Amino acid sequence: MRNDRLGANVLSALLISNVDAGLAASLELKPHHRSLGIITSDCDDVTYVALDEATKAADVEVVYARSMYAGAGNASTKLAGEVIGILAGPNPEEVRSGLDVVVYEIENGASFYSANDDDSIPYFAHCISRAGTYLSEGANAQEGTAIAYLIAPPAEAMVGLDAALKDAVAKGYCDWKSIKVIG
């Protein structure tokens, strides 16, 4: 049905308490990053937002996040999913806290929604009032900046973005100089 929450699923969430030096080097970890949290899910955009939430809630950084582009319904194995994210932190407790936030956000937070009755046209329109370190870096914005994250069919996304920007400027929420569109 229209406006159905389509949801996302965590497929795997694992913790490495004391990362191997070789793996740490290949991930270009900082010296204080001793523990890793690794997560896969069936939805990349939701996972990126969830990873960013973890950077605000725990002493962790996103050190790797990549879409595998198999698609949510086309994962190559049961645990592979569409995306992998890796958090790094100083100890297992911080990383576990970060992973807990990621899992919660994927399962209960940001989501794709249906734009039509048979759920065949999904869209993702999520407002982040205060971006953490991960999304602010990706948006080339200061940490704490508000970000609108929009994924939709291309033409509809552009029309929606135009309407949202016009409304935000008209209401005084921002001015044209403060807006960055990242494609």
Give residue spans per PLM region.
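Conserved mixed alpha/beta catalytic, RNA-binding, or beta-rich assembly cores of soluble enzyme
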Residues: I16-H32, I39-L51, T55-A72, S76-G89, ...
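N-terminal basic/disordered segments at the start of proteins
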Residues: M1-G22
